[in-house]
Amino acid sequence: MTEPLPDVTFPQGFRAAAMAAGIKPSGKPDLSCVVSERDCAWAFAGTRSTTAAACVTRNRELYASGAPLRALVVNAGVANAATGQQGARDNADMADALASVLAVGEAEVITASTGVIGHLLPMDKVLSGVEHLPEELEGAALPFATAIMTTDTRSKLAHVTLSNGARIVGTAKGSGMIHPDMATMFAFAFTDAQVDQGALRGAFPAIVARTFNAVTVDGDTSTNDMTAVLANGAAGETDLTEFLTALEGVMRDLARQIAADGEGATRLLTVRVTGAASEAEALGAARTCCVSPLLKSAVHGADPNWGRVIMAVGRSGAGVKVEAMKVSVQGVPVFAGGPLNYDAAAVSQSMKTDEVIFDVDLGVGSARGEAWGCDLSAEYVSINADYTT
Amino acid sequence: MTEPLPDVTFPQGFRAAAMAAGIKPSGKPDLSCVVSERDCAWAFAGTRSTTAAACVTRNRELYASGAPLRALVVNAGVANAATGQQGARDNADMADALASVLAVGEAEVITASTGVIGHLLPMDKVLSGVEHLPEELEGAALPFATAIMTTDTRSKLAHVTLSNGARIVGTAKGSGMIHPDMATMFAFAFTDAQVDQGALRGAFPAIVARTFNAVTVDGDTSTNDMTAVLANGAAGETDLTEFLTALEGVMRDLARQIAADGEGATRLLTVRVTGAASEAEALGAARTCCVSPLLKSAVHGADPNWGRVIMAVGRSGAGVKVEAMKVSVQGVPVFAGGPLNYDAAAVSQSMKTDEVIFDVDLGVGSARGEAWGCDLSAEYVSINADYTT
């Protein structure tokens, strides 16, 4: 996955287009689509928020139908959430417009919106933009990955090639990483592998739990968060196990990229939990550590304050045996049933790097889980203190 | 409750003492006790953390026995959490030492520790301090309220007098207010009202849910969080309903004081939820708003970003009907089933004050709930980025 980003192309049969339609006040690219020339098997997971946006609600309905997909249209700048019936109509109109230009069914197009909540889409700009989008279709992935960004400081791509030549290309966006109620996160994966939709959908929730949700924490919880994988089968039959393992690798790579690009972040925070009673408890404990403002602040200050790990694990509700619990910071054991003597200055020095890793053994079982976050900086506050006004 | 703080005394039959025992490196007061000359009926609630500290575990055992209390001993500076068997022994020794000097049973003394997690108590200092504490017993409440502080910037007291002359005096500490895994919070109330212990214990959980837990969010979740009320009956029979209402008022006052003194806080954040399906959902929605770093950052910047309220409510899982939902900021309606036109500059100006209030109607029922938090400032990060090293 070291190929220079500008050269990454979508898998065969997929093309994408991006443009500046004027939705973002900045004039940056804000409207984009990915189109498949063949029907796609697909899997999807959307936010569990009770105030989910129109795009999530509509996609979920299409998902339930089980019918194949042909395209995805995304706008950035306006989330079209909490916009009532008008918002639902606008969202459907955005999909219909692309379907019409592509001459596919409107139910073959899913949508995704991200940006400020509570504003209606500027439909004149959206519709005239969508009308011209397909003229720009090309194989390159970077323009799409860039057009879906909001407060992200860099585009997020990950890709892999399977043994039969099939490829998986993933893109993601999301930067407000401090908490589940963050700015919207998307993760999309496109593949020319041929996979059975039932098998894909059966495996997808567990993959999402270990990747996308391991940065969102507490499940999918913004109004617009979503992740989807589209498989058009152009590369022919693909070993399912190999495919799913590779898909998880791409999703995991994207999840880490999102965490590392958290608003105001200077370091990636990785928490690896072992010795848990179940994978769910391991993931829950790891996520609770990654979302803790106290631990995140400590990581920012390169402070090996492992007491905050103990506290966050306790808060997560995961079963622990404190007397058998172990904690390491950057590989240095600091707690084993009780405080250990260690060189705090040296550990602090080792934390002044791009990634800080806490290993935590709960001492009760054999399940494991990993989650990612970022440090909390003063910059986070200044980014978010004045976003709309 | 406007009496100058230095003049507040404990209810009759209670006296307190505080001293600097050398537990805090700063040399500030860090060891204190409250003693009742009569047996106290009591109620208690401790953290639900799975890594609860020794003091919480021991108090819970005493609570289960139902036997009366005579004293509370508190140290600040070291939380004595994640300290294993040695920590449990030290905690019991601290209680035993005070019981011995007071000539009461060791099971009549509860303990509370707050400060850095994972350090053992300096028992030589604690024990020699406890030995001399009772020499300093006096009626004033402020020295005790001050000695239990850690990162608090001010002491927290609230008191009320009932119609029969009985009084309730409450003290609290807690400042790391951004999240449930905050630094430890205590709230203690002392009263000379005579109340039935069974009735008190029956009513206490709901009062805690509406007050103490409405700032801690997600229940009691630090390793050492606790709240307790001690009633020694010296003022004689008291109307139970009047007492419970007054107790809730004192606890609510303390909860707001804790929120307003959040680390780095410049404003109190109050979220009042109505129209919920249940009180639990109303409280959950209000708390989720108060803990949202995005909303807290917006409050810091005086940004009426009500979209973050919609998002936080959605994340809380509370039942909502978005088309019937209403949001007001500082009394100005900004959302009613969809975005409303309002003077954003004027509302922003009105947020530049000590308390910012969001009113949120979920549009599904008639239950209500209120929660308190504070804004998120860059100062929070600097306070917490370098706490132990």
UniProtKB/Swiss-Prot annotation, chains A, B:
Organism: Deinococcus radiodurans (strain ATCC 13939 / DSM 20539 / JCM 16871 / CCUG 27074 / LMG 4051 / NBRC 15346 / NCIMB 9279 / VKM B-1422 / R1)
Annotated pathway: Amino-acid biosynthesis; L-arginine biosynthesis; L-ornithine and N-acetyl-L-glutamate from L-glutamate and N(2)-acetyl-L-ornithine (cyclic): step 1/1; Amino-acid biosynthesis; L-arginine biosynthesis; N(2)-acetyl-L-ornithine from L-glutamate: step 1/4
Alphabetized UniProt keyword annotations: Acyltransferase, Amino-acid biosynthesis, Arginine biosynthesis, Autocatalytic cleavage, Cytoplasm, Multifunctional enzyme, Transferase
Quaternary structure (record): Heterotetramer of two alpha and two beta chains.
Subcellular location: Cytoplasm
Keyword Nucleotide-binding: no
Transmembrane portions of the chain: none
Site (Involved in the stabilization of negative charge on the oxyanion by the formation of the oxyanion hole) location in chain: T114, G115
The name this protein goes by in its record: Arginine biosynthesis bifunctional protein ArgJ
The protein's enzyme class: transferase
Residues under site feature: Cleavage: A183, T184
Recorded GO MF terms: glutamate N-acetyltransferase activity; L-glutamate N-acetyltransferase activity
